[in-house]
Amino acid sequence: MRGDSRLRTTEMSPAETLDLAEFHGDGISAELSEAVHHVAAQLPMEVHFHPVDLSIERRRTDAEGSYQDAEAAIRKLGVAIKYPTTTELESPNKVLRDRFDFTVIHRPVQTIPGVPTRYAGKVDIHIVRIAVGGTYEDAGRRIGTEAAVSVRVIERRPSFEASKFAFDLARKLKCDVVSASKYTIQRATDGLFEEVAEEVAATYPDVQHHAELFDALLAKLIMESEAYKVIVTPNEYGDFLSDAACGMIGSIGLGASASYSFDRDGRVKLAMFDPAGGTAPDIAGQGICNPAAALLAFGMLLEHQGYRALGGALNDAVRDAISAGNTTGDLGGSLNTMGFTQEVCLAMKARLTGSVNL
């Protein structure tokens, strides 16, 4: 059941429910799911998870069946949370992206006090990435033994949907939009992307916009990260930028992302939320993984579904727990997965009851 767009409070009916698909994967997937379920149980509402097995074991014997189950679940419910999956014969992320027609990926990256980092500046950016095209759609082919070639594609519709999402987000955040590509070199492909971004910008007179060359943006982001808030880019540029930004805040394990598909009127039709990290097979099953990104992804899901107060409280609670030094071993702390999750629940309760010192 989708929440409305109004800011919700903790004064909800206990009968209010949220149904979502839950895509289980590999490695630490089960531990991340347990953390998300534990947090969901503390919310003043009922959350119903509808599980789908996307593990490598099932995909080895029934890959098509696993993807069909995932597609049926998200099309019925409209929203899903996904945990890390192993890439073997195919990338499950790409398969799902193609089946669900995901054209936009949104990755927020924000400095968290208390996380050791080699970067002294403050990062608080939203990376909006076209989820298709670029150099990722064509693996290319060899020409003889000494050369290879691949085709790079930029399409108008995904460029429009990513740009519109970025401008809607900037309007909500009251900030400007930077579109970034190599439009002076890739004049046809990146030129089309920037052309579409300009067309969308013209329909948002209240949102400032300018284009920057992607390589220059990387340098300026490091030198003056506070100058950037919403950045929209083609596929591979957004991929590079997302990981670089997570490195600037000290850990790729602190990144969550959302993937979206849209109807003909530009409204979000399907949404999937996932932690950015991998399956971490070296620590799987030990109960010591960091669930922060999975919890942040769940917070994004709650906000998307209209439960803005709850989603915001959860996102803030993750940051509160880490800032207070209540962290897992990868961030220098001593807590295990569930110990950190419990600290997040305490911080979330304090946020929702107004007893936290802001």
Label the predicted regions:
Residues 21-42, 144-215, 227:
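Glycine-rich phosphate/diphosphate-binding loop of Rossmann-like nucleotide-binding domains
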Residues 36, 197, 294-302, 344:
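Buried hydrophobic packing segments
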Residues 46-69, 221:
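N-terminal beta-loop-helix "entrance" segment that forms/cooperates
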Residues 222-326:
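Glycine-rich phosphate/nucleotide-binding loop
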Residues 26-29, 78, 128, 166, ...:
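Buried hydrophobic positions in well-ordered alpha/beta secondary-structure cores of metabolic enzymes
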Residues 19-25, 80-83, 176-183, 296-303:
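Short glycine-rich or small-residue beta-strand-to-loop segments that form or flank ligand, phosphate
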Residues 138-139, 143, 147-179, 183-187, ...:
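Glycine-rich phosphate/pyrophosphate-binding loop and the adjoining helix
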Residues 59-149, 236, 240:
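N-terminal glycine-rich phosphate/adenylate-binding segment common to multiple enzyme folds
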